[in-house]
Each structure stands twice: as C-alpha cells, then as structure tokens.
Amino acid sequence: MANNKSAKKRIQVAERNRLVNKSYKSTVRTLTKKTLANCEKYKQEPNSDNKDLVLVSVNQAFSLIDKAVKKNVLHKNNGANKKSKINKVVKDFLTSK
C-alpha cells in the first residue's frame, strides 16, 4: 500500500480511470453485438427498415470506437481493427441477397 499522499491519490485516480475505461470497452462490445444482430435480422428479412437499422447501429458503433480512441481507452490500431471487422461483416450482409 502507498505511504505518501500523492501515491494514495494516484491509486484512487487509476481506479477511477479503470472503471471509466471498462465502461467504454463494455459499451463498444455491446454496440458491436447489436450491429451484428441487426445484420442477422436484415439477412433473414431484407427490407429498407432493417437496412436503416443496420446503418444506424454501425454509425453508433463507429462513433463510440472513435471516441474511445480519442480518449486513449483503445489504441488507434485496435480501434481501426474493430471498425474494419464490423465494416467487413456489414458489407457482406448488405451485398449478399
């Protein structure tokens, strides 16, 4: 355990940041899963409403990934990799009919 005041404060700050980062990462995973679920829904029933739902969920996921990269929660390469994987899956679903 830390002995001086500044070390104790750093422990508190690190714990606070860890929880915030965990929240961001969890939300990124959730939005990714929702996007993939919407793609499956579109594959089963291709119509314009489901297509719009897929595009909206992709935009939300990309936006949150970009924000996480900007706040150094994710490394920029990791964020680009996540976006690339989502984009590849969505592109495959939207082009295959």
Curated annotation (Swiss-Prot):
Keyword vocabulary terms for this entry: Ribonucleoprotein, Ribosomal protein, RNA-binding, rRNA-binding
Family: Belongs to the bacterial ribosomal protein bS20 family.
Organism from which the protein derives: Prochlorococcus marinus subsp. pastoris (strain CCMP1986 / NIES-2087 / MED4)
InterPro entries documented for this protein: Ribosomal_bS20, Ribosomal_bS20_sf
Role played: Binds directly to 16S ribosomal RNA.
GO molecular function terms attached to this record: small ribosomal subunit rRNA binding; structural constituent of ribosome
Name of the protein in its database record: Small ribosomal subunit protein bS20
GO cellular component: small ribosomal subunit
Disulfide-linked positions: none
Gene this chain is encoded by: rpsT
One Gene Ontology term from the biological process aspect of the record: translation
